[in-house]
Curated annotation (Swiss-Prot):
It comes from Bos taurus. Residues 15-69 form a coiled coil. Pfam families: CC190. This is Coiled-coil domain-containing protein 190. InterPro entries: CC190 (IPR031525). Residues 201-221 have a biased composition (Basic and acidic residues). The keyword Plastid does not apply. Residues 80-144, 183-241 are annotated as: Disordered. Keywords: Coiled coil. Residues 101-120, 135-144 have a biased composition (Polar residues). The gene is CCDC190.
Amino acid sequence: MERHMVRGPLHKHFDLERKSAKQAEARLSQRLQRLEDICLYHVKSLTREQRQLQKELQRLQQDIIKKKLCSYFGNRSQKRPEDVLTLSSQGGQKHRALQANKASALTTNTTQGRSKTKSQMPPFHHIGPKDPMKSKQQALSQNNRTSHFIEEKLQAQEKESINPPKGKGSNESISLLCHNQDVSTHTVDGGPGSGPAGDSEPGHSDETRSNDASTRPDHNPAKQTPLDPVEGGGDFKDKPQTSTYLELFEKARKAHYLRHRVPPESERLLSIAEIFGHKESSQSRAEKGCENRVTI
């Protein structure tokens, strides 16, 4: 009987615990369901907002493209002939600057080539006495002619680029520039100082060329490049030959620098006795060093 009395309240206690556990599980399942519903709602709202934002972004991009196209076509339709003239004048100025640079580079290259050929040519005997002043005047007159010819052609090309005639294109102007450059090279290479034929010409042609050089003044002296380094006339034998950079470099490399036989007192290595305060040894060594220097 006692056992049955004890088992009765235990069974009741277990039943109550089971009921409470089941109720807690039911409550937890309900809360989980609510949380899942809330998550689904938020996900759906986020997807909806994302779609709306994508649509607005596409619409804004289309509006920007339309505005750019409208502004581009509007500027093209509203462009005036004055703007076209300014653009063409700017292009002509750039083209003229390029032409001037090409002409100056061509003249410098031709003068350098002539000087190199002169230095490399072997000496030969001329018939009759050679006057250095006449050859110098002939070279200057020829240089003046070429520079004046190039200036006239450049001015004519500038006028044509500002007011281009009908029926002429850019190809004709380019061919004209190439032809002018060829003519200038032929005139510079065919001068009196380029070969023996120019030195053996008669005196009448020399006089006419000097007269032409005196009558035609040079408007641009900065473009002239002197062909002869001698200014006052005469032969090169009177002028001393200056040594080049390579020769000076070789001399400096071969030079030997002297040094004292005995190192100075500041560079002498101290011994342990001198470091720890033995002054007598340091003084005696200093006296010996002075005596050695005096004997040297």
